[in-house]
């Protein structure tokens, strides 16, 4: 039986707690509180009640029949996380962490965001539970995701653009950490992915595991068996781990994480951390990183803001090393082609992040038999990406 992380938050040599001394007691307290509430029937009941009545779960599994026929080969099934309230998987985690923050007596939540989806999901739960919310966002992403910035402000959050470094997700994370160190007594930091110091990778995974737990039951009821492969995009990797985790002990189900190859992994313009990186320490944990020979973080690139991150969750690093999961990379152009295909064949506009998983499914399906099943995590909808996609087609909105 798979039972990681260990007590100190390690997945093999990855994970752990590499943070300033000032945060150790806050993380210890968070660990203690989370371990208590994880087994608390009342907390769990409230969490599942909110997922059902506020988020709109369970999200269905949809057979992309026309697209599957067009591609030939395996059947492509979509786990429709795009249908959640706020339009992506992120809200599964923010609901859980906000309920925890409330029980810990914290009235202020902070968050970092790349594509803006986690920022929106954090602002949403802050409004839902009457909390103050501050969101840190790289100034580059603020430009790319103007609609989501406005959504956060509508929901009552303060959005702080970050102008340091590459002005993207990693820099927003740095600023959020600084804020937390300064205001730890009244502030809860909602990390949006399975990265950061322990207990975050475990906690975010547990809240996102609703995806895979639902999928297992739905596959059993609707198809009488489990899929041959799971496919999900990986930036930090929370939507992927949410789908993968409940399947880890099922060795006959392949797990495939799809990273952003950007303009190609042979260029410096990509974010394929597991495919090209090597281990190091960033944002409080040891994991694979995109770094130069001196250990300096290299700036990443992806057409999708949510995959534009030089690290990855430590559990993914471990799943790669032990061979349980496979990791591949898909270029901007391949993701765009899959984005357009899903629009045309199925009437579903996917997020650019999710389009990376779709693109790999489109490559894999024709190599398999018609009776094989590929379950793709459609982690979010594409409304936020309209301007980016239009720009690629030479259209200004």
Swiss-Prot record:
Its EC number is 4.2.1.20. The keyword Transmembrane does not apply. SUPFAM superfamilies: Tryptophan synthase beta subunit-like PLP-dependent enzymes (SSF53686). PROSITE patterns: TRP_SYNTHASE_BETA (PS00168). Pathway: Amino-acid biosynthesis; L-tryptophan biosynthesis; L-tryptophan from chorismate: step 5/5. It comes from the Bacteria. One of its GO terms (cellular component) is cytoplasm. InterPro entries: Trp_synth_b_CS, Trp_synth_beta, Trp_synth_beta/beta-like, TrpB-like_PALP, TrpB-like_PALP_sf. Its cofactor is pyridoxal 5'-phosphate. One of its GO terms (molecular function) is tryptophan synthase activity. Disulfide bonds: none annotated. It is an enzyme of class 4 (lyase). The modification N6-(pyridoxal phosphate)lysine is found at residue 90. It catalyses: (1S,2R)-1-C-(indol-3-yl)glycerol 3-phosphate + L-serine = D-glyceraldehyde 3-phosphate + L-tryptophan + H2O. Signal peptide: none annotated. Belongs to the TrpB family. Tetramer of two alpha and two beta chains. The beta subunit is responsible for the synthesis of L-tryptophan from indole and L-serine. This is Tryptophan synthase beta chain. It comes from Nitrosomonas europaea (strain ATCC 19718 / CIP 103999 / KCTC 2705 / NBRC 14298).
């Amino acid at each position: 039986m798979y039972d990681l992380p260990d007590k100190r938050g390690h997945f093999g040599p990855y994970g752990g707690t590499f943070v300033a001394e000032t945060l150790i007691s806050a993380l210890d307290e968070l660990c203690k509180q989370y371990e208590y509430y994880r087994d608390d029937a009342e907390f769990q009941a409230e969490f599942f009640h909110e997922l059902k009545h506020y988020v709109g779960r369970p999200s269905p599994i949809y057979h992309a029949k026309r697209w599957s026929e067009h591609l030939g080969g395996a059947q492509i099934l979509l786990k429709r996380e795009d249908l959640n309230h706020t339009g992506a998987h992120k809200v599964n985690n923010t609901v859980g962490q906000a309920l925890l923050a409330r029980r810990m007596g914290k009235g202020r939540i902070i968050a970092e965001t790349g594509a803006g989806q986690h920022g929106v999901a954090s602002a949403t739960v802050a409004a839902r539970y009457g909390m103050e919310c501050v969101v840190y966002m790289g100034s580059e992403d603020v430009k790319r995701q103007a609609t989501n910035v406005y959504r956060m402000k509508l929901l009552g959050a303060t959005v702080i653009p970050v102008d340091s470094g590459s002005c993207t997700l990693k820099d927003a994370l740095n600023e959020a950490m600084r804020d937390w160190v300064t205001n730890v007594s009244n502030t809860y930091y909602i990390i949006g992915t399975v990265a950061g110091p322990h207990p975050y990778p475990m906690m975010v995974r547990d809240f996102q595991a609703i995806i895979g737990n639902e999928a297992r039951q739905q596959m059993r009821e609707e198809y009488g068996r489990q899929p041959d492969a799971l496919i999900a995009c990986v930036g930090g990797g929370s939507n992927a781990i949410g789908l993968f985790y409940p399947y880890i002990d099922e060795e006959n189900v392949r797990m495939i994480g799809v990273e952003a190859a950007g303009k190609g992994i042979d260029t410096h313009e990509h974010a394929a951390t597991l495919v090209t990186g090597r281990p190091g320490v960033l944002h409080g944990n040891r994991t694979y990183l995109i770094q130069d020979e001196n250990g300096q973080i290299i700036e990443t690139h992806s057409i999708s803001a949510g995959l534009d991150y030089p690290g990855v969750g430590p559990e993914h690093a471990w799943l790669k090393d032990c061979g349980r999961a496979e990791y591949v990379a898909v270029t901007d152009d391949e993701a765009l082609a899959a984005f357009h295909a899903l629009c045309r064949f199925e009437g579903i506009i996917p997020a650019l992040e999710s389009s990376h998983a779709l693109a790999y499914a489109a490559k894999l399906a024709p190599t398999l038999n018609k009776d094989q099943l590929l379950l793709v995590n459609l982690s979010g909808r594409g409304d936020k990406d309209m301007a980016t996609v239009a720009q690629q087609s030479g259209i200004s909105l």
